[in-house]
Design a protein with these regions (language model features):
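Conserved inter-motif catalytic segment of the P-loop NTP-binding fold
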Residues: 91-174
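The Walker A/P-loop phosphate-binding site
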Residues: 12-116
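Non-membrane alpha-helical structural segments and their capping/turn regions in soluble enzymes
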Residues: 67, 145, 176-180, 184
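Substrate-engagement module of ASCE P-loop NTPases
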Residues: 180-199
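A conditional alpha-helix N-cap/helix-loop micro-motif detector
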Residues: 51, 141-142, 179-180
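Amphipathic, non-transmembrane alpha-helical secondary structure
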Residues: 71, 75, 79, 142-153, ...
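Structural recognition of the conserved hydrophobic beta-strand(s) that form the central parallel beta-sheet
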Residues: 58, 162-164, 194-199
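Interdomain "pre-motor" coupling segment immediately N-terminal to P-loop NTPase/helicase cores
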Residues: 1-14
C-alpha cells in the first residue's frame, strides 16, 4: 500500500515536471525567433493605442466621462473611421465588437448604445451586426466572467471587447489575489482570441 502511494506521488510529480518543462520551453524567447508586429487597430491622432492580442484601460475619477470616451473609441472601431480624436480599423474577420457593461441599468446601457451608433453615423433604430452590447449588472462576478468567457468561445470574430466596470468582475476590489486573477483572465482572453480588450 505504501509503495503504491509512493509510485502515485512519483507519477504525479513526473507529470507536473513534464508540464512545467513544456511550459518553460514554449515560453522561451530566442534571438533567432521572429514575430510579426501585432495588427494596430486604434489610434489617437498618430499614436497607436491598441493592437490585437493586448489590452488597455481608461482611468479617471468617477463621473469623469470615461464611458463617453469609450463610446467614441467603439464608434470609431464600428465605423472604421475617425470619431473625435480616435481612428480605428478592425481587420477582416475581427470586425465585431463585444461591449460588456457591469454597472449601469438597461436604460443607461441603451443610452450608451444609442450614443455609439450616433457617433458611428449609424441608425439608432436598427441593431448593428458588428456590435453585441450586453448588460450584466444583476449578476454575480463569477457569472459575469462565465458569460463573457462563453461569448468569446462562440467564435464570433470579435476584434475589440469593452469591459465597462472591470472591478465588478470581482467581489473585493481590495483583494490582490482576486485582482491578479481577473487581470490574468483578461490576458488569457486577449491572447487566446487575438483581440484587444479595453477596460
Amino acid at each position: 500500500m505504501e509503495n503504491e502511494r509512493r509510485t502515485d506521488q512519483k507519477t504525479g510529480m513526473g507529470l507536473e515536471e513534464t508540464r512545467l518543462s513544456d511550459i518553460l520551453s514554449a515560453s522561451q524567447i530566442k534571438a533567432t525567433d521572429t514575430y510579426e508586429t501585432p495588427p494596430q487597430i486604434i489610434w489617437i491622432d498618430n499614436s497607436t493605442i491598441a493592437t490585437l492580442g493586448n489590452f488597455s484601460a481608461s482611468t479617471g475619477k468617477a463621473k469623469s466621462k470615461k464611458t463617453f470616451n469609450v463610446s467614441a473609441l467603439v464608434a470609431a472601431s464600428l465605423a472604421g473611421k475617425q470619431v473625435l480624436n480616435y481612428r480605428a480599423h478592425l481587420p477582416e474577420g475581427k470586425r465585431r465588437i463585444l461591449y460588456v457593461d457591469t454597472e449601469q441599468s438597461r436604460y443607461h446601457c441603451h443610452t450608451v448604445l444609442e450614443r455609439i451608433l450616433r457617433l458611428a453615423g449609424l441608425p439608432t433604430t436598427a441593431d448593428s451586426e458588428n456590435l453585441d452590447f450586453i448588460c450584466l449588472r444583476e449578476y454575480s462576478p463569477t457569472v459575469r466572467i462565465s458569460v463573457i468567457d462563453y461569448a468569446l468561445r462562440q467564435g464570433k470574430g470579435y476584434g475589440l471587447v469593452i469591459i465597462d466596470g472591470i472591478r465588478d468582475l470581482m467581489l473585493d476590489i481590495n483583494s490582490t489575489s482576486e485582482s491578479v486573477e481577473v487581470i490574468n483572465t483578461t490576458m488569457v482572453w486577449s491572447s487566446r482570441y487575438d483581440m484587444h480588450i479595453h477596460c
